[in-house]
Design a protein with these regions (language model features):
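GST-like domain detector, emphasizing the conserved glutathione-binding G-site
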Residues: 1-139, 143
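Short helix-capping/linker segments at secondary-structure and domain boundaries
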Residues: 2, 24-26, 158-166
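GST superfamily/GST-like fold recognition
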Residues: 141-165
């Protein structure tokens, strides 16, 4: 069985978990402490970061983008797309994942001014996504895709941020 290594509430792991769940791939998850990473984890993770996915063949994969692409290649894709559409989907997914850490930084802001500046930058990213969505619920219209899965961690945290300022 596939094994996913994580720490609690990691947006990069949430993206991988979303892909696993959407594809109905059974997996187990093992949580580690971010501030006290075990040596076995440091031995298998080239960058010492999560997520790490260990395949059925004991191959260790790292970096969420690479893991999600592996899952799409290994298991039935959520959808069949042209090479051009696949590149567009990746680009929109990268737009999401590059904002994971800035969003976490926004949530950890120490003062109101820093929070508001960081929030304004995040809002720009969401406005671009909303423009792409148009009147549809999902990036591809009426069904969830890999792009939507990439945006899930941001949307989850946006809800948390909104709840804290309202």
């Amino acid at each position: 069985m596939i094994k996913l290594i994580s720490f609690k509430n990691c947006p990069f792991v949430q993206r991988v978990m979303g892909a696993l769940v959407m594809k109905n791939v059974p997996f187990e998850i093992e949580y580690i402490e971010l501030n006290n990473k075990p040596q076995w984890f440091l031995d298998i993770s080239p960058n010492g970061q999560v997520p790490v996915l260990i395949t059925e063949n004991d191959t260790v994969l790292f970096e969420s983008d690479a893991i999600v692409e592996y899952l799409d290649d290994k298991y039935t894709p959520i959808e069949e797309v042209s090479p051009e559409q696949k590149a567009l989907d990746r680009a929109w997914s990268y737009q999401a994942s590059k904002h994971y850490m800035p969003q976490c930084g926004t949530m950890a802001s120490k003062d109101k001014e820093t929070f508001e500046t960081r929030l304004a930058n995040l809002q720009k990213a969401f406005l671009k996504a909303e423009k792409k969505l148009g009147d549809t619920e999902f990036f591809k219209g009426d069904y969830i895709s890999n792009v939507d899965i990439a945006w899930l961690p941001l949307l989850h945290r946006a809800f948390v941020i909104k709840a804290s300022i309202c």
